[in-house]
Amino acid sequence: MKYLCLLLCFLSFGFSSAQAQSKTVPVSEAWAGNSVNAVVFRKNSLVTYKNIQFIAFYNQKGKLTLGKRKLNASKWEIVETAFNGNIHDAHNCISIMVDGDGFLHVSWDHHGNPLNYAHSVAPLSLQLTDKLPMTGLNETNATYPEFYKMPNGNLIFLYRDGRSGKGNLVMNRYD
């Protein structure tokens, strides 16, 4: 029994020392009047593509704000976009994803609103296109946007079209 306890102590020490150290990297000032930047149903507010990390949030003025940094860097490049979000409704979260070609895709400000979607003008860029439709169908009443990356780099975009209890799940594929 004594040896079993010693073995467990050594194993737990080995596992605890093998864990990666976490590091906090400040980004920028953001809206903090409610949970819109941190709601539990928010999907992909921080994504990594190769050695570049991207982040999206609403700043204190309610502007959709994007950032990127190299993984080991502590300084973020921050861009305030021309797009606004209703920061007073925590449903209006932002979702981002980078596709297999390095383009950043962004969806924001949805709580029964028309689809707000744009993507970067070039790979790894923080500059966005104007608002774009995806398919043009079922894009007038969107809530809960979520991007998912497929193993081949293509994207799946999900959202609810319609009201609570009377909506449909919409799934778009981006290739």
What are these regions (language model features)?
Residues 1-22:
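Bacterial Sec-dependent N-terminal signal peptides
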Residues 21-175:
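Extracellular, repeat-based ectodomains that mediate carbohydrate processing or recognition
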